[in-house]
A protein has these predicted regions:
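Conserved acidic residues
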Residues: 89, 184, 216, 239, ...
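Short boundary/hinge segments that flank catalytic cores
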Residues: 1-119, 127-145, 155, 163-164, ...
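Inter-motif core of Ras-like GTPase G domains
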Residues: 213-215, 227-248
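Phosphate-binding/switch loop-helix module in NTP-utilizing enzymes
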Residues: 79, 166-228
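Structural beta-sheet core signal
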Residues: 122, 185, 220, 243, ...
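Conserved G/P- and acidic residue-centered "switch" motifs that form tight phosphate/ATP-binding loops
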Residues: 20, 103, 124, 221, ...
Length: 295
């Protein structure tokens, strides 16, 4: 009961002081009206509402000068600095609870890195409530589950720019998107009865090694840490874990517990990303907006 009244951490300094890990990025809250306006400017042909909604959540794909794209470029650079003392080929992104912007962060960071010319693989490791496929307008099956049970190889299930073109995002939208040809996706596949068994097996270790050998960076979109054990099982098997935290949504006690669970499992926590941050928490973004519109 006490936790339900827990005060959330409000500033970057508070987060770093409380968790003792660096804040790698601050992703600003988006103005959906502005994004819709930009989409119509970039793609003047009429788009159906579903395509508009999908594009709005991955605006760095087409709006490289926007404030969201800037936020993800900063995250990319800070990640590189945070990992400069060790080779990082695989990362897991996780959050304490539901709805903290983890999948949005994973997809937009992957897009940003792909725009640099690096081959990126996004793996939907949420075998309970997966969303990567729906967020990109792709089919869910086959995917990771089929690979882990041995029915298919990863080469048979990986989806590429060609699949994105034929999906709900639209042919022209992907064709004109910088870096889309470097973006690779493995969706979750069928939903198994006990996903934790998959992530506690040698097969996932071998599979991660295969991914690392074939891509510049592999990013796992994991389920939230506190409800299920999956992210804690994956964490030690990849090169680093990034926590995604939405200011004001989750209290500091659950956030600290999530970090502690990862540390107890010997996972290497690279840092934390603050998602959906309003200007009141990050006044520097107000300044950024001023310069953006006055330039």
């Amino acid at each position: 009961i006490r936790e339900s009244f827990d005060t959330s951490i409000g500033t970057i300094e508070d987060v770093e002081a409380f968790l003792h890990v660096p804040v790698l990025g601050v992703i600003p809250r988006e103005d959906r009206k502005e994004i819709a306006k930009t989409i119509k400017e970039v793609f003047p042909e009429s788009l159906d509402p579903e395509s508009l909604e999908l594009l709005a959540s991955i605006s760095p794909l087409f709006d490289l000068k926007g404030i969201t794209a800037e936020g993800y470029r900063s995250l990319k650079v800070n990640l590189q600095f945070a990992c400069q003392d060790r080779e990082v080929k695989s990362l897991a992104f996780a959050s304490a609870g539901l709805g903290e912007g983890k999948t949005t962060t994973v997809l937009n960071l992957a897009i940003t890195i792909a725009q640099d010319g690096r081959r990126v693989l996004v793996v939907d490791a949420d075998l309970r409530k997966p969303t990567v496929h729906s967020r990109l307008g792709l089919k869910r099956e086959p995917g990771l589950s089929e690979i882990l049970v041995g029915n298919l190889s990863w080469q048979e299930v990986v989806q590429t720019a060609a699949d994105l073109m034929l999906g709900k995002l639209g042919f022209d939208q992907i064709l004109s998107a910088p870096g889309a040809d470097n973006l690779n996706i493995i969706t979750c596949g069928h939903l198994p009865p006990n996903p934790s068994e998959f992530f506690n097996s040698q097969r996932i270790v071998d599979l991660i090694a295969e991914f690392e050998a074939n891509f510049d960076l592999v990013i796992f979109d994991c389920p939230p840490i506190l409800p299920v054990a999956d992210a804690v099982l994956i964490g030690p098997k990849v090169d680093g874990v990034v926590l995604v935290y939405q200011v004001g949504r989750v209290g500091r006690t659950p956030l600290l517990r999530a970090k502690t669970l990862l540390e107890n499992a010997q996972a290497h926590i690279v840092g934390v990303v603050l998602s959906n941050v309003s200007a009141e928490y990050s006044p520097e973004y107000q300044k950024h907006q001023y310069y953006k519109y006055s330039s």
